[in-house]
């Protein structure tokens, strides 16, 4: 919601004719997608349609080979950028199954990540105060900051941990891959509220989901339906109603 005042929108991401292959098998077959600041884009599609492949290609996962087309971030072609460079530039991706990092405390991990992204070393006292506030909003006990990243975390705790990373790092482009997967109703609401708190006129969000519950507090500006590596339909959030009613067979 932009309010009554006109907001100047900035192009965050522009994908042109993107083809992506995995092990020489073409998964994406000509994707065009433009995302501006302040926008929330939802990507839906049956399993194997190419949703996660798209996010991994944007994040420069080396398993996913861009064979044709271009990815522009803030007007700059990033085809040759490494994953690390994209992350430092403000591109964030959550995962369906977040990895555990034994030996690295969550609080230390977030403080170091924030330093790398911002280029500034945050005050420990100020950082810890802000971290506690964000953890409280996600109903995570502050003791989690001293636990190793995702080690022994339940599925719900791992997803909340990723939203904590999102809110702490405050990236320009957030890509959330089935963040609601495996969560109970209460956890979905907490995660949904966390995403809503992050959204602003200065950033943009791509959400992959099969369920509308995650979007309970989030207004989707565009919904895209993928099938066989192509975007076949783009519309408003009424497309989600159609999917819930008819499934993907009509696509």
List each model region and its residues.
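ABC ATPase NBD Q-loop/coupling interface
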Residues: 70-86, 150
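Short coil-to-beta microelement around the adenine-binding A-loop and adjacent beta1/P-loop entry
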Residues: 25-28, 85, 189
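Conserved beta-strand-loop-alpha-helix hinge in the C-terminal portion
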Residues: 222, 226, 230-251
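ABC-family P-loop ATPase nucleotide-binding domains
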Residues: 99-172
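Helix-to-loop junction immediately C-terminal to a conserved catalytic motif
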Residues: 59
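The feature captures the beta-strand-to-loop junction immediately N-terminal to the Walker
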Residues: 44-46
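Walker B catalytic motif
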Residues: 178-179, 186
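Conserved structural motif at the start of ABC-family nucleotide-binding domains
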Residues: 13-15, 28-30, 35
């Amino acid at each position: 919601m932009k309010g009554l005042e006109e907001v100047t929108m900035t192009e965050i991401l522009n994908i042109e004719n993107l083809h992506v292959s995995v092990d020489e098998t073409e998964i994406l077959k000509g994707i065009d997608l433009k995302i501006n600041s302040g926008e929330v884009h939802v990507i839906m599609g049956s399993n194997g349609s190419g949703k996660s492949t798209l996010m991994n290609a944007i994040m420069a996962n080396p398993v996913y080979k861009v064979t044709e087309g271009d990815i522009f971030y803030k007007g700059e072609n990033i085809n040759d950028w490494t994953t690390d460079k994209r992350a430092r530039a403000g591109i964030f991706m959550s995962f369906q199954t977040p990895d555990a990092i034994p030996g690295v405390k969550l609080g230390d991990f977030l403080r170091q990540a924030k330093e790398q992204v911002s280029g500034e070393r945050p005050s420990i006292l100020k950082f810890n105060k802000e971290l506690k506030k964000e953890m409280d909003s996600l109903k995570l006990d502050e003791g989690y900051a001293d636990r190793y990243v995702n080690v022994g975390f339940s599925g719900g705790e791992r997803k909340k941990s990723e939203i904590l990373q999102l809110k702490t790092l405050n990236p320009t482009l957030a890509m959330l891959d089935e963040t609601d997967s495996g969560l109970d109703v209460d956890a979905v609401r907490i995660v949904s509220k966390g995403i809503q708190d992050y959204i602003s006129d200065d950033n943009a969000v791509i959400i992959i989901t099969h369920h509308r519950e995650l979007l309970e507090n989030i207004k989707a500006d565009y919904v895209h339906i993928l099938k066989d590596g192509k975007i076949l339909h783009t519309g408003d959030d009424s497309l989600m109603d159609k999917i819930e009613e008819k499934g993907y067979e009509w696509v």
